[in-house]
Amino acid sequence: MEKQSLTFDGDEEAKIDRKSSKYHPSIWGDYFIQNSSLTHAKESTQRMIKRVEELKVQVKSMFKDTSDLLQLMNLINSIQMLGLDYHFENEIDEALRLIYEVDDKSYGLYETSLRFQLLRQHGYHVSADIFNKFKDDNGSFISSLNGDAKGLLSLYNVSYLGTHGETILDEAKSFTKPQLVSLMSELEQSLAAQVSLFLELPLCRRNKILLARKYILIYQEDAMRNNVILELAKLNFNLLQSLYQEELKKISIWWNDLAFAKSLSFTRDRVVEGYYWVLTIYFEPQHSRARVICSKVFAFLSIMDDIYDNYGILEECTLLTEAIKRWNPQAIDGLPEYLKDYYLKLLKTFEEFEDELELNEKYRMLYLQDEVKALAISYLQEAKWGIERHVPSLDEHLHNSLISSGSSTVICASFVGMGEVATKEVFDWLSSFPKVVEACCVIGRLLNDIRSHELEQGRDHTASTVESYMKEHDTNVDVACEKLREIVEKAWKDLNNESLNPTKVPRLMIERIVNLSKSNEEIYKYNDTYTNSDTTMKDNISLVLVESCDYFNK
């Protein structure tokens, strides 16, 4: 017997107590579809590509011609911060092997910190004990370091690369920050700009494409800049930006065709912001297919979140969960009309992904389906908690909400469109919820809750981890947020540890997970800038996706 769809007449609908909040509309609209001035002319693009190849040859020669290891370290550091390192992976790997073997006992603070940073960033096991030489007999950092702004900044940045038990890096963090703040007014422009940038968010927690865009502006004012590298950075960024604009135009047209902004008007219309979030996971051109697939998945997940969290009643959410678990078009029986539309388009989009994948890649969609099913189940649990006014313990909350953070689903989606490196073994590893994925989920969940707490409680939202901690420890919101931030820092140490060689899966895959954690730090730095996107999110999107670099000023 066919199930009857869950429908309500006008009077019944009016009586339903929905939690719906008003989100501001898309601030971008059709900008990336209609603005023809965004992309460069074909002839201009070809000239830029030709010039980039010429400049790359010159930079590769720099690696060969540089015998001084400090100059080599500075070269690698500049290339990485300018977003050029994917062009020079072999040269950097070879240089790091030399740098690893060097005896750094005679190095000063800057050189020691830079060496440690570069090696840790690439998974080398280097001991933090090397920084003990900068301490006095009382265990304090020596006072002669206080005026060394460049060295202090480098030490400050590496202090965030620590793993559990490396207390000297925790001490370095506490020591360097006030010193750098006090020196700010005395520094030359380029160094002051770097200090300001990294005090806001340290180097190892910045997403690479936004860092590249911001660092270009700093580097061009540096008296010690290399003009070949600067020109390459600007041209390379503009070429990447053109690619991103093409991707976003296609995604925006796809989004408009789905028409969710009209049929599901209670949801956040954030397809541009979602694309930017995915872009921070992998900005390199070879990941174009993966970015587009992941961005489309992200758009569907954002809607799903709003259905469970902001609009659907418990009966509707239960029906949607059962339909998602079945993953079959026939499962729409019983769904209200607005959910039928969403559900069928979800299934159709996943079929399109499968068609796009190679024959030996199609199995990946089964893993992604399982992730979406787990996400729906976790959303339903939170919906039930909200109805019951249940405030779970922190452990009970995290057992469910690490999944509802969506981070593990986004990670899986980010792997689907990648190349041969994304093997079945990688997906099996991912589905086991390894430590590095758990840490990423902790960071995403807790940062979201810390920044969204006041807004969400003001609209009768399910208890967050902030409420769970407050109830369990009988404390106030400020203490709860401080303690949750400490848990975030522990999760970062887990991430740092899991990033050291040898990694359990190819390093490229670990980096996707770390990059998602970095983007969570940026997006939830001051508030939920995805939901409230007319903030720093808008500024950052403009920098990366709209404003090109003036590469004629070398």
UniProtKB/Swiss-Prot annotation:
It catalyses: (2E,6E)-farnesyl diphosphate + H2O = beta-eudesmol + diphosphate; (2E,6E)-farnesyl diphosphate + H2O = 10-epi-gamma-eudesmol + diphosphate; (2E,6E)-farnesyl diphosphate + H2O = alpha-eudesmol + diphosphate. Expressed in rhizomes. Detected in stems, but not in leaves. One of its GO terms (biological process) is defense response. Disulfide bonds: none annotated. The keyword Glycosyltransferase does not apply. Transmembrane segments: none annotated. The Asp-Asp-Xaa-Xaa-Asp/Glu (DDXXD/E) motif is important for the catalytic activity, presumably through binding to Mg(2+). This is Beta-eudesmol synthase. It comes from Zingiber zerumbet (Shampoo ginger).
